[in-house]
């Protein structure tokens, strides 16, 4: 989220869509609550996604970056409300300031059909990440 939010040009009236700071706060909260200390590398798909986002920024393809923001951030807005009820911690990443209907409407004004292919790529990267995490979980036992 941090890389995406740095790369995309977000209109000032939509800055409240940003999640990176809240995600960081959620991670810190869970680290403290469960005495966790993250170790190891991220799955390869995280690095692949990051490279893809920076490539779009280098190409000045803000339209494509906004497609990724729509998929990721509005997934948190919609499905995240259910997830928040089921996870430990405050789940700040799922909280959006202000009128969410207005936020959705204003962001959708930036979208068009030409962004569909890039939105699909965003889903593909997410699927790749979930596959990698599933394989890792098969090989590890985590005590919380």
Q: Residue locations for each model-derived region?
A:
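Metal- and O2-centered redox machinery and metal/ROS homeostasis
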Residues: 1-144
């Amino acid at each position: 989220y941090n890389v995406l939010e740095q790369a995309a040009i977000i209109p000032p009236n939509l800055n409240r869509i940003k999640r990176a700071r809240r995600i960081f706060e959620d991670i810190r909260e869970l680290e403290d609550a469960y005495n966790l200390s993250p170790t190891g590398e991220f799955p390869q798909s995280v690095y692949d996604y990051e490279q893809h986002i920076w490539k779009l920024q280098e190409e000045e393809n803000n339209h494509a970056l906004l497609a990724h923001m729509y998929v990721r951030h509005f997934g948190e807005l919609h499905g995240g409300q259910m997830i928040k009820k089921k996870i430990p911690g405050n789940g700040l990443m799922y909280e959006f300031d202000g009128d969410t209907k207005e936020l959705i409407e204003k962001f959708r004004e930036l979208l068009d059909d030409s962004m569909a292919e890039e939105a699909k790529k965003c889903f593909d990267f997410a699927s790749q990440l979930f596959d990698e995490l599933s394989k890792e979980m098969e090989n590890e036992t985590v005590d919380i």
